[in-house]
Structure formats: C-alpha cells, structure tokens
Amino acid sequence: MSATAYADTSLLASLYLADANTPAALAAVSAAGAPLLLTSWQQFELENAFQLRLFRRESTRADLASAEAHLIQDISAGMVAIVALPVASVLPIARQLTARHTALVGTRAFDIFHVAAALQLKATRFLTLDTRQRALARAAGLRTT
C-alpha cells in the first residue's frame, strides 16, 4: 500500500453517519484517492461517536447498524485498511508536536495524537474538518485535503 490517508475520527463519523459535515467528509475522502488507515484507537473513538449520536438523538439504532455495515463493507473492499498503532512510539511524536505547535496553533491533545499517529503510520494524507488540526498537520509536513 503506497498512498494512504489518515482521517480524524470526527471526519470518519461524518463519513458513516449523515450530518452537516457529510458532504465535506465525502469530498475529502474522494480527493485523497487513497485507502483510509484505521487503528483500534480510531475504531474505539468511532464507536463512541456513534453511541453519542444515539444519546443525543441525532441517529437511530438502525442508522448505527447501517453505518457499521458500511464500514465493514469498506474494509472488505480495501477502501479502509485496519492497521496496528504502537501507542508507545506515537506519544514521543505527540509530545514534540505539542512543544513545537500547541502554543501557536491551539490544538487539543487528541487532535495532536491523531496527527502524531498519521506521522508514525507514514500516511501520505491527513483528512480533517478541524481548522486547527489541519494547521498542525500541515506544520508537521502532512498533506491535507
């Protein structure tokens, strides 16, 4: 797998459960033109995002089942690739990003973690709908859409 894209979990949630950001998420994934990397951390965060949508009554159980089926279909089709993320090796990268950029960009810890994970996994693109996270990804040398 040569070209790969790492998507922030909020973008993934909008990709699989329709909301106001779904068109932008679809456009970002289409523009990336590469398989999306998916770590166990992102899977956990996505599961939680789905459950929060249920709690907030923004989605139904049927919506969640459909979203999960769509994700499984994308994994089977090779559009999403499950990858291992060695967290212990991501934290030093995240700490470096924090020291260099947080005071300038104003990024939150989990946003930094995702950028660090993308760097560790050698993703060729970083997909996010968050402007601060996008600025951090660019400052870290990642291509964004």
Predicted regions and their residues:
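Active-site-proximal, substrate-binding regions of enzyme catalytic domains
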Residues: 43-98
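A general structural signal for well-ordered secondary-structure junctions
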Residues: 22, 34-35, 77-81, 104, ...
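Active-site neighborhoods of divalent-metal-dependent phosphate/nucleic-acid chemistry enzymes
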Residues: 80-135
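Short, well-structured N-terminal submotif of metal-dependent ribonuclease cores
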Residues: 1-66, 131, 140-143
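Conserved beta-strand termini and adjacent loop/short-helix elements that scaffold enzyme active sites
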Residues: 39, 85-87, 145
